[in-house]
Each structure stands twice: as structure tokens, then as C-alpha cells.
Amino acid sequence: MSALPSLRVPTLPVAFEAAARAAGDRIALEYGSSSITYRELDAAANRFARRLLREGVTPGSRVGLHMTRCLELYIAMIGLLKAGAVVVPLNPSHPVTVRRSVVREADLPLTLRDVPAGLSSVTVERDVHELLAAGADLDDTSPGLCTDPESTAFILFTSGSTGRPRGVRIAHRGIARVASYNGEVEVRPDDCFLQLAPYSFAASTTDIWLSLLHGARVVVLPSQLPSLPKLAHTIKEYGVTFLNLPGGLMNLLIDAHPEAFAKVRTVIVSGDFPSAPHLARVMKAVPGTVYNAFGCTENSALTAVHPMTPEDLQLGVVPIGLPLPGVGLHVLGEDMTPCAPGEVGEMHISGAGLAQGYLGLPEETAAKFPTVDGVRMLRTGDWARTTPAGEVVLVGRTDQMVKIRGFRVELREVELAADQSGLVEKAVVRAVDATDGQKELVLFCTTATGEAPSIEALLADLKSRLPDYMLPARVHHLAELPVNVNGKLDRMALREPRAVLVEPDGTAQQQPVVRDIIATTVTRLLAVVTGREPIGVSDSFLASGANSLQVIQLAASLHDVMGVDVRPEDIFQLDNAESLAGHIRALRQGHREVPA
């Protein structure tokens, strides 16, 4: 097995500076009615980098980035990289316990923020806007400190089997390699990208860096959980031509607003895969090309692409395609030798995109990144086979990692979080097919007393520990967990009983008499969205198993049926039909406030 030809890759600041010189006064970023050109963005990032150096940041310093979506986020991110710092993104929408865990694991001496302080006592928090103002008069030329493509650019935290997030160290070369890419997926300077993915996830590298390093325009969505009308309006209003969407959200968008795709030239389906009927409609609506894409954090995101055809849909098998330049895909058997076409083995990745490893986890790094015949590789944990044309088709997972709404989730991390709640004795999580064709998590548990736990209390505890995409849709209490003939847990024997919500004493919940017509309508719409029985007006949406995509769908249904525009994040915050009904009344009276 031979190594790939060497790919000359610069650092991210060097690649961005080249793109900025070529783009000049073209718009780089748009956010609402505000915009910034490439020339302005580069100069602002240079001034910010120099301010950071005066604050004591040195090449190799790890700095947290704890910000909401705004133009200043990108100035800060690029400025940090120009100062030679390692960027550690913190998602403000994640539970504070998750963010504090990242601060602790990454050992962050400094965190830049535009959100309220008080994240953690182990990091110094500085306001980004104050630092920008303090550096406004500094030299706006590049400090030229970041020149080694092998140096660490980002540490991105992913789901881990140990029950705590693990940091993936990503080198500049891993992301900057896309600067020289213009192959199967063509990026034009007149393209307009939509920045949808959270910047703390590897999927955002396509939205941010594939665009900026080619001089394209990036439209930043104010929310990572947009309503469907808002998403469609943004695509049309700003003339978005390049869309990178998870499959579940694509399903909802083509159902509700097929016209949004009318002028989109390129669509990349990433994360989870859309249903074949939805995909066929997207392919018909898009005047350009729809691609199936594969990527993972350990290979700095975008890895392989495949232009989808009607024949793919007829066969029911869509390859992830061929690797990007500088990337190798290898399907290997147990003896670590290449499998013949059609033979199933584990997919491995080699090349310029490989991460440096896991932060502080040398043994896990060695196991995940083996050297095979002198070539460093990544074991993806995906069963795969190659086609006669050399493309790779995924056929399953080798471990307990699953994809939920486009995010990779270790089932063990969810189980450990439930065990730590103190409400269950033992928890086991399975991924099952949902009514919308996506995957969802179901938690099975036992208790020391044999009595069912409070489902709402358990889910509330999990919500404080885990991101929303890792929350189980349903919880089932069992007298005991099934075991096989060897006395080991038999996951496949776990079956869902008929869905009945239970109180802590094990009795079925009694639904209150509903007299609020708006709340009643909300529960009925939620039942349609989730494919389950209507819940009570005071029951938690979270406890009923509603996920972020279903909340977006509920917001769209409320718009269609009741003529009100409810933000998905407000639905998450209010969390029951009774409170949401009050909010809807306030909206109808012209008030935007979310009731406490």
C-alpha cells in the first residue's frame, strides 16, 4: 500500500490571505443587513491578531471561542489563527456542563466571548467587542506568525465512549487542503454559501472554509435552528447557490418550500441521508447537481463526494464517491490488506486531512490512527465495500457510534449520562428508525427499587448534561435487561412496549381535560409531526420525544394552520403546549416576548 502523492498545503491564514488579495472588495460575509468585504475582513483579523498578541496570546496557545453568530465571530476566529493560536469553539446552545467540560479538558487559559461571563473559573473570559475596539488603531498587516501547516488550528470536541467529550486536534493542512480543491464539486467566486452548521462542528468547515478560501460569499444564519420559512426566505433573498444540508432538514425544506431550491447550483447532502422520494424531488428542483458527501471530524470533515443520479435512487445504493485530492479511501480486511471489489471490510482514510489525534488520549489515538504498511490511517468504524468503478459504499457500523440528525453519537456516552443521573440503576440506549425515516434514540432502564423513574426528571437531567441531538426520544422502564446465553447484555432483544407514559409510582398518566383550543391544536399538530399519540397540554415536548427537526416542523405547521411565526428555539424553551399557547396569544397581540 503506497502513500499518496505529497499535497502542498499552506496554513489557513496564508490560504485566506491569498484568497482575500484576489477577492479584494467582493463581499466575504453577510449577516442580516450587515456585510464585510474580503479586504475589510483580512484587515480586521490582522488588527485583532495583534491585539491578542499584546494580551499575551502566543503561537500554540489554546483559546476558547464562546460566541453567538455575528460577523465578529469570523473576525475573531481568523484573528486567532493569524496569531498562531489554537481555536477551541464552545457552542453557547449546549448545556453549561458540556461547555465547562470542554474548558476543563482543553485546559483553556483564555476564552473570548460575546455571551454573559461566568462560564468557568478555570479560564479568563474576555469580551470580543472590547478587544476589537482596543485594537482598532493597530497595524492591519498580517503578523505572519502562522506558517507551519502541521501546527494545530482547531480542537473540536465530539461524542466519546468514556462518557465525556473528546477533543480532536485538527492541523491547518487538514482544512486548508480545500483551498486547492476545485474538482468534482466546483466552487466559483460568484457562489453564495449558507453558513448553517454550528461552528463548533466539523461540518461547518465546508460552509466557512470551502467558501472563503475560494473567494465566495457566505451568508450567516442568525440561528442554527431556523424556521423553515426563514430558511427558505434567506436562501431566496440572498441568492444562495451552494447548500450544505443534513438529510433530515433537506426532507423538511423540500416538503415545505420546494421553490427555495430553484436557483441553487450545488447541494451537498451531509450527515444523515434523506429519503429516496425526497431526494428525487430535490434533484428535480435543483438546476445544478446534488452530491452525497462523506466526512468526519477525524479527517477534518469533507472527505469524499458523489454526484447523485436517478440510477442511484433506482438501485437504492448511493456511494459516498471518490476521495478529494490528497485523501485516500481504503477498505481493509481483518488482516489490514485491501478487500476485493464487493467484499466488505472496514473503511480507512489516509492523507492530508487526518487529524493529529485525540487531546490527552495517546492510547485511543494509537488505536484509531494505526500505521499500515508505513502509511498513517484513520479507522472510521464504518463497514464498506468498493464498486468496480472504485467508489466506496457504506454498509454499516463496527461499533456503537450512530448518526442522529447528522451528528455522530456514541451510545455509551448517553448511557453513562443516564447512569450518573442517580435516577436509574442501569441504562441501555438503542438507535431505532423513526417515523420520518431518520434515526432516534430510545433509552431502556432499570431501577434499584423496581419502580419506574420520573421520565420528565430523567430527561431534564439528561438535558443538563447532553446536547439536544443526544437526548432519547423515549424512555422505557424494564424489570430487568435481557441477556444472551453467555450472560451478556442482548441489545437486539430490547423491544419497545406499547408507548405509555408512566408516573414515578408506575401508574399510567391521566391526561387533564383540555379546554384551551390553541393548546389542543398544538398537541394535535405535534402528534402529526412525531407520529405518536397526542400528549397533555402540560406535558414536556422533550419528554414526548420531540427532536430539533420535529420542532422545526411544528413551527412550520403552526405557521400554516394558525398563521403565526413561532421560532423553533422558543418552542424548545417553552416546552409544553400550555406555555406555547400563551406565547401564540402574545404574538397575535403584537408581543414577541417568550413567557417565563
UniProtKB/Swiss-Prot annotation:
Involved in the biosynthesis of the antitumor antibiotic sibiromycin. Activates 4-methyl-3-hydroxyanthranilic acid (4-MHA or 3H4MAA), a precursor of the antitumor antibiotic sibiromycin, as adenylate. The activated substrate is then covalently tethered to the thiolation domain. 4-MHA is the preferred substrate, but it can also use 3-hydroxyanthranilic acid (3HAA) and anthranilic acid (AA). Has lower activity with 5-hydroxyanthranilic acid (5HAA) and 3,5-dihydroxy-4-methylanthranilic acid (3,5DH4MAA). This is 3-hydroxy-4-methylanthranilate adenylyltransferase. The keyword ATP-binding applies. GO terms for cellular component: cytoplasm. It catalyses: 3-hydroxy-4-methylanthranilate + ATP + H(+) = 3-hydroxy-4-methylanthranilyl-5'-AMP + diphosphate. It comes from Streptosporangium sibiricum. GO terms for biological process: amino acid activation for nonribosomal peptide biosynthetic process; antibiotic biosynthetic process; secondary metabolite biosynthetic process. Keywords: Antibiotic biosynthesis, ATP-binding, Nucleotide-binding, Phosphopantetheine, Phosphoprotein, Transferase. Belongs to the ATP-dependent AMP-binding enzyme family. Its EC number is 2.7.7.97.
